[in-house]
């Protein structure tokens, strides 16, 4: 029995990145031997065990054979006869197909170290195409390591393109797709993930609504970058630079989907794109079974982001309607994320990334003014039920009118 560290633990150590999770492969062992040593079985499809002392994961060396469509269509074979090289060849990328023993000796049959030093993401073998989820994984790795200069090998990108065009991506479950998408969006350069998906023709299958934005012009006076797709990537990039949560990043990606449906004869103007985008945002949310908080913010940002940009010009009554749409009195954080998403939208324009965005603080001030209206005096006056709600609305409107009369600092 021999035990090796494999995959990300080896890759990240060689890159000088802190290793957080360690996966190990066991060569020359049986399930019975692992159980006899006290390991706890956890794998449903193939033999994976946990060390009860520290929770580390150990998997028996295995091979796999394609048996059906999608990422789940595989037959696995684990036995003491499976070699380390046979186990490593089933992995996605050469940089993930290296192993290391306890003495630090590297096993690298597929030249992962060479590709690591050259900053190349390259598939190990043609078997890469047997798992469509790998298209998303490679795009995610491209986003994760973009700051180190990693790029996808041309032949790997071509294989990803063939896989995208084969229809195999349609076999992915919403849950597995969203897991990869959400992880990728939380990388430091999530815009690279979207760009790689577009480069390999996967974006038009996974998110055709986003793919449709590329090549759609906007007025140069407001958008020096002109292209709506380029703008969307820039907005997402700004959200990542400002360390925003997944809810904000998802909303930034989807906020302008309506612009992809603007009639050609109306370009480059996009009148009512906010309203037209709502059904598209809803469709993407449903396609990937997106968590409710991400769904809700994406829809609200899509509908109201131009309100945010015009915040200083809005009437008090319109501000009140905006605050009520966000349920700002019970969910203030959601309105805060809206203000941030609007700012990221404004910063995601070529040459305007550092421009001050006073609208965000103005929106925060409006929310504060409305929230500070006390209910107790109205209760003391005898208001209750629907009448209390109307009285509260009137007082909040007064507060917003007073707020608008204050000088903008």
Swiss-Prot record:
InterPro entries in the record: CCA_bact, HD/PDEase_dom, HD_domain, NT_sf, PolA_pol_head_dom, PolyA_RNA-bd, tRNA_CCA-adding_enzyme
Keyword tags: ATP-binding, Hydrolase, Magnesium, Metal-binding, Multifunctional enzyme, Nickel, Nucleotide-binding, Nucleotidyltransferase, RNA repair, RNA-binding, Transferase, tRNA processing
Classification lineage: Bacteria, Pseudomonadati, Pseudomonadota, Gammaproteobacteria, Pseudomonadales
Pfam (any one): HD
Function in brief: Catalyzes the addition and repair of the essential 3'-terminal CCA sequence in tRNAs without using a nucleic acid template. Adds these three nucleotides in the order of C, C, and A to the tRNA nucleotide-73, using CTP and ATP as substrates and producing inorganic pyrophosphate. tRNA 3'-terminal CCA addition is required both for tRNA processing and repair. Also involved in tRNA surveillance by mediating tandem CCA addition to generate a CCACCA at the 3' terminus of unstable tRNAs. While stable tRNAs receive only 3'-terminal CCA, unstable tRNAs are marked with CCACCA and rapidly degraded.
Sequence positions that bind Mg(2+): 21, 23
GO molecular function: ATP binding; CCA tRNA nucleotidyltransferase activity; cyclic-nucleotide phosphodiesterase activity; magnesium ion binding; phosphatase activity; tRNA binding
NCBIfam families according to UniProt: PRK10885.1
Keyword Ribosomal protein part of the UniProt annotation: no
UniProt xrefs under PANTHER family: MULTIFUNCTIONAL CCA PROTEIN (PTHR47545:SF1)
Catalytic activity, as annotated: a tRNA precursor + 2 CTP + ATP = a tRNA with a 3' CCA end + 3 diphosphate; a tRNA with a 3' CCA end + 2 CTP + ATP = a tRNA with a 3' CCACCA end + 3 diphosphate
Entry's Gene Ontology BP terms: RNA repair; tRNA 3'-terminal CCA addition
EC number(s) per entry: 2.7.7.72, 3.1.3.-, 3.1.4.-
Gene3D superfamilies xrefs: Beta Polymerase, domain 2, cca-adding enzyme, domain 2
Keyword rRNA processing attached: no
Note: A single active site specifically recognizes both ATP and CTP and is responsible for their addition.
Organism per entry: Pseudomonas fluorescens (strain SBW25)
The name this protein goes by in its record: Multifunctional CCA protein
Family note: Belongs to the tRNA nucleotidyltransferase/poly(A) polymerase family. Bacterial CCA-adding enzyme type 1 subfamily.
Residue ranges of domain HD in the record: 228-329
Cofactor(s) named in the record: Mg(2+); Ni(2+)
SMART domains, per database record: HDc
Cofactor binding, note field: Magnesium is required for nucleotidyltransferase activity. Nickel for phosphatase activity.
């Amino acid at each position: 029995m021999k035990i090796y560290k494999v995959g990300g633990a080896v890759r990240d150590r060689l890159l000088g990145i802190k290793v957080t999770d360690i996966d190990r492969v066991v060569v020359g062992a049986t399930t019975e031997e692992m159980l006899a040593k006290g390991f706890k079985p956890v794998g449903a499809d193939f033999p994976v065990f946990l060390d009860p002392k520290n929770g580390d994961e150990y998997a028996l060396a295995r091979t796999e054979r394609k048996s059906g469509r999608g990422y789940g269509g595989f037959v696995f074979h684990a036995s003491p006869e499976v070699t380390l090289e046979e186990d490593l060849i089933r992995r996605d990328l050469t940089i993930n197909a290296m192993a290391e023993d306890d003495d630090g000796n590297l096993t690298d049959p597929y030249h992962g170290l060479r590709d690591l030093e050259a900053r190349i993401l390259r598939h190990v073998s043609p078997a890469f195409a047997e798992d469509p989820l790998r298209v998303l994984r490679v795009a995610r790795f491209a986003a994760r390591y973009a700051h180190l200069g990693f790029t996808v090998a041309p032949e790997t990108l071509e294989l990803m393109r063939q896989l995208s065009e084969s229809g195999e991506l349609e076999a992915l479950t919403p849950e597995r797709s969203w897991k990869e998408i959400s992880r990728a969006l939380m990388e430091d350069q999530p815009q690279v993930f979207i760009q790689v998906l577009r480069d390999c023709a996967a974006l038009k299958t996974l998110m055709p609504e986003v793919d449709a934005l590329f090549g759609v012009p906007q007025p140069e006076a407001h958008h020096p970058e002109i292209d709506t797709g380029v703008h969307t990537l820039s907005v997402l990039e700004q959200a990542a630079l400002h360390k925003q949560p997944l809810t904000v990043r998802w909303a930034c990606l989807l906020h302008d989907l309506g612009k992809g449906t603007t009639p050609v004869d109306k370009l480059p103007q996009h009148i009512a794109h906010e309203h037209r985008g709502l059904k598209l945002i809803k469709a993407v949310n449903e396609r990937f079974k997106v968590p409710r908080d991400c769904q809700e913010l994406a829809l609200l940002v899509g509908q109201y982001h131009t309100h945010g940009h015009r915040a200083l010009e809005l009437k008090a009554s319109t501000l009140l309607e905006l605050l009520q749409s966000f349920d700002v009195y019970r969910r203030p954080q959601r309105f805060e994320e809206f203000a941030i998403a609007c700012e990221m939208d404004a910063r995601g324009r070529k040459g305007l990334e550092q421009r001050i965005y006073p609208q965000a603080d103005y929106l925060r001030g409006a929310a504060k003014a409305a929230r500070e209206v006390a209910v107790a005096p109205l209760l003391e006056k005898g208001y209750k039920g629907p009448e209390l709600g109307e009285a509260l609305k009137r007082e909040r409107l007064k507060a917003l009118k007073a707020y608008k009369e204050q000088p903008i600092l």
